[in-house]
Every structure is written in structure tokens, then in C-alpha cells.
Amino acid sequence: MGKYFGTDGVRGVANQELTPELAFKLGRYGGYVLAHNKGEKHPRVLVGRDTRVSGEMLESALIAGLISIGAEVMRLGIISTPGVAYLTRDMGAELGVMISASHNPVADNGIKFFGSDGFKLSDEQENEIEALLDQENPELPRPVGNDIVHYSDYFEGAQKYLSYLKSTVDVNFEGLKIALDGANGSTSSLAPFLFGDLEADTETIGCSPDGYNINEKCGSTHPEKLAEKVVETESDFGLAFDGDGDRIIAVDENGQIVDGDQIMFIIGQEMHKNQELNNDMIVSTVMSNLGFYKALEQEGIKSNKTKVGDRYVVEEMRRGNYNLGGEQSGHIVMMDYNTTGDGLLTGIQLASVIKMTGKSLSELAGQMKKYPQSLINVRVTDKYRVEENVDVKEVMTKVEVEMNGEGRILVRPSGTEPLVRVMVEAATDEDAERFAQQIADVVQDKMGLDK
């Protein structure tokens, strides 16, 4: 069986790997597995997308596939991934679909599904869809005549979602000046509207999408421009979202980056103080900084580590009934309010803590001392072979001996791209960079595409 689904749906270069033909099949087979075979003759399906130019092409093909199986499709237009998850659950739809490749370059696109409960698919559901994709021509229902359903536009869904987000905070942001970076993606209009509606004074960059500039030197993967904007406009802080709005990175008033670990710590500390943190637990991944765990320990907060990927964080949160979790990269899940990482939700919760405590973001983030961390991505021929490569294991052992317990190493395949990620934490910046480069050089030499 071919593996179509990665850790975050089906992704690839639009019109080359993720073709309209594949999008049609994903709509048809996904609609059948997740909605139609539950006995619903005309299951309701919500479809949203980000701002990529390929989104319209894939949306048309996907919707055709869904309608061909009998689905009643409501098109949400440009909206964030967590917006689709929330509306799917809130409106009682059988299925939600988001067309986006998140933080990836504009040439890529992706399709991810949400069940009626607003959660991403289980491995079993993905396997069922993949089994149909691997068949030559599976015999599935084909409605005809009056059984073919019109699709409709529900662009008001975005406002319904923003109204819900606004209801999750008890304060307005009058007196706060906030710089926003929409990554020229899904939150480009949503973020300024939401924070403006909460009476913040806003400055914006990356909020002028043209179909081609999504994530281009902007957004949560490139917060440097936002840092400049914060300092230049004397903003209290800045918030950078990614292309589909499911992750967030902040910038303090001095232009210093505040990552997902620090944001989780700030929000978790406030929840713990207010006795709102379930089981005094925050769920994180193996990528979280050593300083994050030490800071939690000092606050009397426990932590659980998962594999990298917000789906694994969510699985652990559901298993243990935990209500806060996330990743250093800025996927932060607040289960009391939504079922997936939500940049806008996290942003207003962070702003709420800043407003209520009267403390600056640098002061709040400074309570967590980060260990220097170096991350190098290596493009490789087969990312899954890194775990068995003898030469890579050998250099990792050598570095661990040299570190003498003062740091850690993590080498793993990316869940969404043909990359091996090499992460090293050490006592100093120089050590972290040197050790990471030593390991990355071996990965490149033995497995790299350009070796």
C-alpha cells in the first residue's frame, strides 16, 4: 500500500504530486469512509482553504469528488485550519476538510480531514482511505438525478469562528499595541479583525496575500521581520502565525523571539495559578527545550513528552484528559476551546495574560531560562533510514561523550518533508551549533540528496 498520509494529511507539490485527480479521489473516498458509510445519504461536509494559488484548483476537484459520493458541501473559503475544525464540530457536520500545506512553500499544498468531533483522523481511518486509493476502480455509490446535491458557500463561517474566539477571553485589549504577521495566509484578514474587535491597537505585516507570497519571509517560520516591526512601532509585543493559522510564535517588546515552549509556560503558569490546568500537566514533544521542563518543575507543573507532531500531542491529551499541550514550533492546543492547534486562540489567551498581569512579555517569558539549541535540516533521499544508519549512530555517540551529560541530541525524520532534522541542546550556543553541524555533516555525507 502506498503511504499517502503523513503526520498532517496528504501533502505534495500541487499539480505534480497532489494533483486534481488525487484531490478528486480524496474527496470521493474520504467522503465515503468518513461520512457516507455512516448511513447518511447526504452527509454535510465543510471545506476551507488557505491563500495558495493552487487552492482553488484543488478545492474544485475535491468538492467534485465529495458531491460524486452524495455529500452536501459547504464552502468556507479562506479560513484557518482550526476554524474548520471548530465549525465542523459546532455545526454538526459529518466531515471537515482543509486545503493547506501550513508553513510549507507556496508550491506545496495539502488536504487534511477532520471528523465530526473536530479531531484529525485516526490511523485506521487513513488506512481505509488509502486502501481505496490503491484500488483500480472501487465500486462506491454514484448518486444520479435528484440525488446529486448542490454545494453552497458559507463564508460567514469565519465570522462565526471569530465570535467564538472572542468569547473565550474576559478582558479587552484596550491600551495594548500588538503587531501581527499573518504569513500572507489564512489569518491575514482574521487576525487584524479579531484583535481590532478586542480593542487592541494593531500594526500588521504579512497580511496582503496574492496567492504566491504565503510564508515568504514572513509568518511564524520567519519572525525576524515582525521583530523589526515591533521595535520600530514600539509595540507591546508581536504575534506571527503560519500559513494555515494553526501555529504561533510571539515577539517581545525588545524584538526577542518567544517560542511555543515559552508561550505554553506562560499560559500554563496562569492556568495552574487559577486551578484550571487539568492534572497539573502540560503535554509537549521531545523537541521542547530542557529549560521548559526545569521551569515547569519549579512551578509544580508536570509534563508528558510525545513524538513530534501535534497529532501525537492531541492523542496524549485525549488519553489523559489534559487541557494544555503543544510544540516548540508554536502548535499549541487548548482543549477546553478547540481540538487542534489554534494560533488565534493562543494569541488572544497570551494577550489576556499580559493584560491581566500587567507584566511585559519579556518579563513573563524570562521566567523560563532556555538552553541554547541548534536545529539543522538536511534534505535526504530516504529520511526513514536515518534511524538505522551506523555512521550517524557513531557520530551521535561521540558527541554524547563529549557533552558529558550537559545537553541532549535528537535526530529524526520530518513528518511532512523529505528532511532529517538534527537538534542539539548544549551548555553554550557555540557547543550546540558545533555538535549539530558535526552530526548534520555525517547525515549529509551518507544520506544527502546533494552528496
Swiss-Prot record:
Q: One Pfam family, please name it.
A: PGM_PMM_III
What is one Gene Ontology biological process annotated in the Swiss-Prot or TrEMBL record? UDP-N-acetylglucosamine biosynthetic process
On whether Phosphoprotein is a keyword of this UniProt record, the answer is yes
Kindly provide the PTM information from the record.
Activated by phosphorylation.
Active-site residues per Swiss-Prot or TrEMBL entry: 102 (phosphoserine intermediate)
As for what it does, the entry says: Catalyzes the conversion of glucosamine-6-phosphate to glucosamine-1-phosphate.
Q: Which residues carry this modification: Phosphoserine?
A: 102
Which protein are we looking at?
Phosphoglucosamine mutase
